[in-house]
Amino acid sequence: MGPLSPARTLRLWGPRSLGVALGVFMTIGFALQLLGGPFQRRLPGLQLRQPSAPSLRPALPSCPPRQRLVFLKTHKSGSSSVLSLLHRYGDQHGLRFALPARYQFGYPKLFQASRVKGYRPQGGGTQLPFHILCHHMRFNLKEVLQVMPSDSFFFSIVRDPAALARSAFSYYKSTSSAFRKSPSLAAFLANPRGFYRPGARGDHYARNLLWFDFGLPFPPEKRAKRGNIHPPRDPNPPQLQVLPSGAGPRAQTLNPNALIHPVSTVTDHRSQISSPASFDLGSSSFIQWGLAWLDSVFDLVMVAEYFDESLVLLADALCWGLDDVVGFMHNAQAGHKQGLSTVSNSGLTAEDRQLTARARAWNNLDWALYVHFNRSLWARIEKYGQGRLQTAVAELRARREALAKHCLVGGEASDPKYITDRRFRPFQFGSAKVLGYILRSGLSPQDQEECERLATPELQYKDKLDAKQFPPTVSLPLKTSRPLSP
């Protein structure tokens, strides 16, 4: 049969059918034209994602992004970089932050809902919902749940206590009495009892800082003098809450005294932390109680030594895109590398290996936290797929590098002495320099806005969000009895 003539085609299809078919073909052609071009407009020239590259979000079914978030910002663990991406995401999506009056929620005291700016307790008037709680606090679940819904996504980050100790010593040397009295970290770890006193001002920075930040109670600790095993306990012990297996809301209360006086038998010997990290603070059963509670509360705990891998898993858990978790490192100290791992001890000198072992032994509760959440992270990686993860991590790093070259002078962080714009100069504290960023000139207005979000330090970004949520009221000028000068 020969080709159909126009008249025969019209008889077979009919005018209406031909119109529908023509519309379909035109729609497909228009869509292909759109998709074929560079349609990512946020940063022209930086379209790194190729059509064949795997997406972090599942193809089918699609999932809505999680936007009720509780991030426990632990100290000296890379948490400022996570905070930066939360600031940026919430700012871009018009989300409402639970903000402190200044920059921390009364730390080192336990978190209280009353410290959230704009918080109204029940019966105190209409309460606008909060989406993100993410600034420094000592975790207190009972009070957090006064501010955030129980189905929020809870997450945090931990770091190898050996690396954390190095960073904390240089940063908090003037704050911690134990660090201040010690000439060096090596001297402190060689004889920590000669410097450290439980309960002394700022000395929570000197031992088991992660455990402290997570709001966990501390067991009785032996003192150097007189062998007293009854030091002062936490004056405000947290009321721990446990999420029972298969339960919905985080609700069930656990008596912290059960952790202070644990049973002596341990059934799972694989989860014990071997000597020297066992030291003298807390039995294995005490530690396992604490870890079980954290598992019941937190949906994800990131690991600083595997920061990029953790970001990919975070994006997957939140159903966010890759660009949502691509950012610059913040609050990094000069001479320190984010993600530098001491876990394997490979490449360390004998002196460094000794310091690492002593730091983990002294911070044995933090070491238990780290080992536990390192294992849980890698179990999550196995479930996600290592090949898929490697592809996503490579894409994330390529995107970060391209953004740095596009946004920053020299394509990298800068010494703070060269940062003249106060909006981008990070707060300097402690003996180590905290690096910041200098933006390139000549950026388009759209690129300038995006690069500013990426480069803004945490304190300045918090102030920006504060002004956005609580704009200053315009007051009338005061009347004066004297005439004004011309």
UniProtKB/Swiss-Prot annotation:
Activity dependence on pH, as recorded:
Optimum pH is 6-7.
Q: On the Lumenal side, which residues?
A: 40-486
The coiled-coil segments of this chain are none
Q: Which SUPFAM superfamilies match?
A: P-loop containing nucleoside triphosphate hydrolases (SSF52540)
Please name the InterPro entries in this protein's record: Gal-3-0_sulfotransfrase, P-loop_NTPase
Task: Give the UniProt tissue specificity note.
Answer: Expressed mainly in placenta, thymus, testis, ovary, spinal cord, trachea and adrenal gland and at low levels in brain, lung, spleen, prostate, small intestine, colon, stomach thyroid and lymph node.
- Which residue ranges run through the membrane? 19-39
Q: Name one GO biological process term.
A: glycoprotein metabolic process
Family under the similarity heading: Belongs to the galactose-3-O-sulfotransferase family.
Q: What is the protein named?
A: Galactose-3-O-sulfotransferase 4
The gene from which this protein is expressed is GAL3ST4
